[in-house]
């Protein structure tokens, strides 16, 4: 029975890539800078001491980081016995965003340039805004700028509740984000607005990767909170991913846990499981792993590393999340059967010590574990698509156009 379990620690980069200068990210290192802060006692908020990731270390994380950066992360064990295969991978795609990273993991790098809204104020074309107001029958809109999602709620959340005007904002990513109050505006109404925005962006030729619904609750600035009902409306990958090939060619199954289905625009997904928060995502993943039959991929995105700690530049929170993940990792490893493979990886970096609030262009870890996987270094990989090609070979689908089999 062949099954693959893919766990994406969203934004968990392990050192700047060779082309990081194109992105202003030379020197970025999500893992390294978190470990450094922990070792100095600068991340003792809710946790204490050096970064403690014994299980990820045994799977080769510290070695992969050393391969990427040339140094061992502060306070971590560079001499631990390694029981998995490990690598550090460079991104072939032109961006450092979520869809590009995930699509490339599944064998389809993004070799075109996304469209972006680069103006920090008055970010969106007036023609687009006018169409949204008219089609969705809106009283107007707020925002129309670049912003952190939590900051803009404190700035405009109360006005949104009073006026019913949705909050439109973007970032350095190829995104159009809409924040609305779940109760006063309504979740269904927000989703409908996002569908309209997706249609207008596509028909207008803006080439924007995602429209993101950002629902929130609360009654005043300072206590607004985003909920787990986020919904991403992505464009479809430009070619069949390994997920699609497994379903189409082998009548296989692909289970999405968390936001995976949204990222792939539901292409190649046979079952969707929603969960919010690290523990809930872990619980859902464990249940799906236990239920998984032959020719199945269980694919989970642990979004909190990116959304809750990376973008918010919360080093202690990120460290605490990693330690929780590591504590629970043996539960996943115990479910890996004789012919199964477990792959732990990331989709980009988001160094919480870095300037600004955006992603960072970094190598990602590729940690592969299974009874038949030979432990040791798989070296520097030229593309995340090596993961997709490895899965294509493992399941016996037609090969992907990019990437090399690592096993």
Swiss-Prot record:
One of its GO terms (biological process) is 2-deoxyribose 1-phosphate catabolic process. Its EC number is 5.4.2.7. Mn(2+) 2 binds at residues 306, 311, 359. Mn(2+) 1 binds at residues 10, 347-348. The keyword Repeat does not apply. Binds 2 manganese ions. InterPro entries: Alkaline_phosphatase_core_sf, DeoB, Metalloenzyme, Phosphopentomutase_DeoB_cap_sf. Its cofactor is Mn(2+). GO terms for cellular component: cytosol. One of its GO terms (molecular function) is phosphopentomutase activity. It comes from the Bacteria. Signal peptide: none annotated. Gene3D superfamilies: Alkaline Phosphatase, subunit A (3.40.720.10), Phosphopentomutase (3.30.70.1250). CDD domains: PPM. Keywords: Cytoplasm, Isomerase, Manganese, Metal-binding. It catalyses: 2-deoxy-alpha-D-ribose 1-phosphate = 2-deoxy-D-ribose 5-phosphate; alpha-D-ribose 1-phosphate = D-ribose 5-phosphate. Pathway: Carbohydrate degradation; 2-deoxy-D-ribose 1-phosphate degradation; D-glyceraldehyde 3-phosphate and acetaldehyde from 2-deoxy-alpha-D-ribose 1-phosphate: step 1/2. It holds the Pfam family Metalloenzyme. HAMAP family: Phosphopentomut. Belongs to the phosphopentomutase family. Isomerase that catalyzes the conversion of deoxy-ribose 1-phosphate (dRib-1-P) and ribose 1-phosphate (Rib-1-P) to deoxy-ribose 5-phosphate (dRib-5-P) and ribose 5-phosphate (Rib-5-P), respectively. This is Phosphopentomutase.
């Amino acid at each position: 029975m062949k099954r693959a379990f893919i766990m994406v620690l969203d934004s968990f980069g392990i050192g700047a890539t060779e082309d990081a200068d194109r992105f202003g990210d030379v020197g970025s290192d999500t893992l390294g800078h978190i470990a450094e802060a922990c070792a100095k006692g600068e991340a003792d908020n809710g946790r204490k001491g050096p970064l403690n990731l014994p299980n990820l270390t045994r799977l080769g994380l510290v070695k992969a980081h050393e391969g990427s950066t040339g140094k061992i992360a502060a306070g971590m064990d560079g001499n631990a016995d390694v029981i998995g295969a490990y690598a550090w991978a460079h991104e072939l795609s032109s961006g450092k965003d979520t869809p590009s990273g995930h699509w490339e993991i599944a064998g389809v790098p993004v070799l075109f340039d996304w469209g972006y809204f680069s103006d920090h104020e008055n970010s969106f074309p007036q023609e687009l805004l006018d169409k949204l107001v008219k089609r969705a029958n809106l009283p107007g809109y707020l925002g129309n700028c670049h912003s952190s999602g939590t900051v803009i709620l404190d700035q405009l959340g109360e006005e949104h509740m009073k006026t019913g005007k949705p909050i439109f904002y973007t970032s350095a990513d190829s995104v159009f984000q809409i924040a609305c109050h779940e109760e006063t505006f309504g979740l269904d109404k927000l989703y409908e607005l996002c569908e309209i925005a997706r249609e207008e962006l596509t028909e207008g030729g803006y080439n924007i990767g995602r429209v993101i619904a950002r629902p929130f609750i609360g009654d005043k600035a300072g206590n607004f909170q985003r909920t787990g009902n986020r919904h991403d409306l992505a464009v479809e990958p430009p070619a069949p991913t390994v997920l699609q090939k497994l379903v189409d060619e082998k009548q296989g199954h692909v289970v999405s846990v968390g936001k995976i289905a949204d990222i792939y625009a539901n292409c190649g997904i046979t079952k969707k499981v929603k969960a919010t928060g690290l523990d809930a995502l872990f619980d859902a993943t464990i249940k799906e792993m236990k239920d998984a039959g032959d020719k199945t991929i269980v694919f989970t995105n642990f979004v909190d590393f990116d959304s809750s700690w990376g973008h918010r530049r919360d080093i202690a929170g990120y460290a605490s999340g990693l330690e929780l993940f590591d504590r629970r990792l043996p539960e996943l490893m115990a479910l890996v059967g004789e012919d199964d493979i477990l792959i732990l990886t990331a989709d980009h970096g988001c160094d919480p010590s870095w300037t600004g609030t955006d992603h960072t262009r970094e190598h990602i870890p590729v940690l592969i574990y299974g009874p038949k996987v030979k432990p040791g270094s798989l070296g520097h990989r030229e593309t995340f698509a090596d993961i997709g090609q490895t899965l294509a070979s493992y399941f016996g689908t037609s090969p992907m156009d990019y990437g090399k089999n690592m096993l």
